């Protein structure tokens, strides 16, 4: 009988990426296969997130449910990873005796050894250290699961915003070597991946070593990835305004593979609150980045993060945020009510905004952004959009689902042979969370991924002129 592994994941795309690597790791080295049912598993792993309110309590509630499974099967191994594991460490074991393994985001590569230790009789194995980039050297080769893939290019954050736990749970910024990233993406492209999303807590802080000892900037990395054969779309998540430099903006001018969609968190439109958050920039600087981006790529659409009700936020501060939203015209947002995170500087500030006021501000903010998003959607009516077909529609498996360059989901009737390829669809209807399209053409009619023979390339060269100079016409 095969050994079964169940992983429950909470939180960001980095956690989703880490969970996929845990599955690959335990599958390759110890023969575990994934199961959706916790009751079937020999190992239960909980990959946690500490961003949301009461994150710790959510973890212990889940562990309480899993304890009943361990009571029935004492050989069941339970592991807790992710940011709550980094934050709480041994305290998790003290409170939940059913837990066997506690590991941080930077030590997931040691899971096979930790499991062996538990099997050998150790009562608790805990490793929440920060061994820099070591984990990437110990992970199996990437495995594609569809036409899109996430690739982590760096770990941690060194910005220390006053409200954020990430520097304390994932460590400071550490970049992967450029060649390692290029190799991973090339391997994914060979397996049919067409779109890659570069991941990091602050990707535009990327400074990876090259093979010659020089440093690769994020802008350089974007161009290198875009040049990989088979990669037709490129995204990245998440970035920070203070390092969104002009060289990155320039990539939008000359690299069509980089999509016309950007998630750039701002958190607040009030300079006073931005200062209290230790964001390192003012509202006008954020708007300047957006202006320059739209000059380089006029059709780019922007999403962001907002925190409402930060300590000391007045009605005027909130109106400044609403003004920024009106000025920028966002396509979507992830917006939250502020709640203190233990161990962060902001946790020492008085949480002095009334909860009902926080809820009202959040509702007002979301309503404004929803209006802006719907306006963008309506502008797409009747247009032809190129989408990457990801698979069957969630609501109707007889239809297909794809995503536009601007990250909108489109459902349409089409043949399953189009899954994993690009198609053009006409937008015929608009809904709050998706679009409806009508199939126009498939990839075979688009002249995409066309291979050129040597004689084709030579044919583009004109004969030498009187000065002996040849010209190349792309």
From Swiss-Prot:
Residues 378-441 form the TRAM domain. [4Fe-4S] cluster 2 binds at residues 157, 161, 164. It comes from Shewanella amazonensis (strain ATCC BAA-1098 / SB2B). One of its GO terms (cellular component) is cytosol. The keyword tRNA processing applies. One of its GO terms (molecular function) is N6-isopentenyladenosine methylthiotransferase activity. It comes from the Bacteria. The gene is miaB. It catalyses: N(6)-dimethylallyladenosine(37) in tRNA + (sulfur carrier)-SH + AH2 + 2 S-adenosyl-L-methionine = 2-methylsulfanyl-N(6)-dimethylallyladenosine(37) in tRNA + (sulfur carrier)-H + 5'-deoxyadenosine + L-methionine + A + S-adenosyl-L-homocysteine + 2 H(+). Keywords: 4Fe-4S, Cytoplasm, Iron, Iron-sulfur, Metal-binding, S-adenosyl-L-methionine, Transferase, tRNA processing. Its main location: cytoplasm. It is found in: Cytoplasm. InterPro entries: Elp3/MiaA/NifB-like_rSAM (IPR006638), Methylthiotransferase (IPR005839), Methylthiotransferase_CS (IPR020612), Methylthiotransferase_N (IPR013848), Methylthiotransferase_N_sf (IPR038135), MiaB_methiolase (IPR006463), rSAM (IPR007197), rSAM_horseshoe (IPR023404). Belongs to the methylthiotransferase family. MiaB subfamily. Residues 3-120 form the MTTase N-terminal domain. CDD domains: Radical_SAM. It is an enzyme of class 2 (transferase). This is tRNA-2-methylthio-N(6)-dimethylallyladenosine synthase. Binds 2 [4Fe-4S] clusters. One cluster is coordinated with 3 cysteines and an exchangeable S-adenosyl-L-methionine. Its cofactor is [4Fe-4S] cluster. Gene3D superfamilies: Methylthiotransferase, N-terminal domain, tm_1862 like domain. The keyword Signal does not apply.
């Amino acid at each position: 009988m095969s050994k079964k592994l169940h992983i429950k994941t909470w939180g960001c795309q980095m956690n989703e990426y880490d969970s996929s690597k845990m599955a690959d790791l335990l599958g390759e080295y110890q023969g575990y296969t994934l199961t959706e049912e916790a009751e079937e598993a020999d190992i239960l792993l909980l990959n946690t997130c500490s961003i949301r309110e009461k994150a710790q309590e959510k973890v212990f509630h889940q562990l309480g449910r899993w304890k009943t499974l361990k009571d029935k099967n004492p050989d069941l191994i339970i592991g807790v990873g992710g940011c709550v594991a980094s934050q709480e460490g041994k305290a998790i074991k003290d409170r939940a005796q059913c837990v066997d393994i506690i590991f941080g985001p930077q030590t997931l590569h040691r899971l096979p050894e930790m499991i062996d230790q538990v099997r050998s009789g150790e009562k608790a194995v805990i490793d929440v250290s920060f061994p820099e980039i070591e984990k990437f050297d110990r992970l199996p080769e990437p495995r594609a699961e569809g036409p899109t893939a996430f690739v982590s290019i760096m770990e941690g954050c060194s910005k220390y915003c006053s409200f954020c736990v990430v520097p304390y749970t994932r460590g400071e910024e550490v970049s992967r070597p450029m060649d390692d990233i290029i190799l991973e993406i090339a391997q994914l492209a060979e397996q049919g991946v067409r779109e890659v999303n570069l991941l990091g807590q602050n990707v535009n802080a990327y400074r990876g070593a090259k093979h010659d000892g020089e440093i690769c900037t994020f802008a350089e990395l974007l161009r290198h990835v875009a040049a990989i054969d088979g990669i037709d779309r490129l995204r990245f998540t998440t970035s920070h305004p203070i390092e969104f430099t002009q060289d990155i903006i320039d990539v939008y001018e000359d690299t069509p593979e980089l999509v016309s969609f950007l998630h750039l968190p701002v958190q607040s439109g009030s300079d006073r609150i931005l200062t209290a958050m230790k964001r390192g920039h003012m509202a006008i600087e954020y708007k300047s980045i957006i202006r320059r981006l739209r000059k380089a790529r006029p059709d780019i659409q922007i999403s962001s993060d907002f925190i409402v009700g930060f300590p000391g936020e007045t009605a005027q501060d909130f109106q400044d945020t609403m003004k920024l939203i009106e000025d920028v015209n966002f396509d979507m947002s992830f917006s939250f009510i502020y709640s203190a995170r233990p161990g962060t500087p902001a946790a020492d500030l008085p949480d002095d905004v009334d909860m009902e006021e926080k809820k009202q501000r959040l509702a007002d903010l979301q309503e404004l952004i929803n209006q802006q998003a719907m306006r963008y959607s309506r502008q797409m009516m009747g247009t032809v959009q190129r989408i990457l077909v990801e698979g069957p529609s969630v609501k109707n498996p007889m239809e297909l689902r794809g995503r536009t360059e601007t990250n909108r989901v489109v459902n349409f009737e089409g043949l399953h042979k189009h899954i994993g390829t690009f198609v053009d669809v006409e937008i015929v209807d608009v809904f709050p969370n998706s679009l409806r399209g009508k199939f126009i053409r498939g990839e075979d009619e688009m002249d995409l991924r066309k291979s050129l023979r040597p004689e084709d390339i030579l044919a583009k060269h004109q004969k030498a002129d009187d000065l002996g100079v040849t010209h190349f016409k792309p």
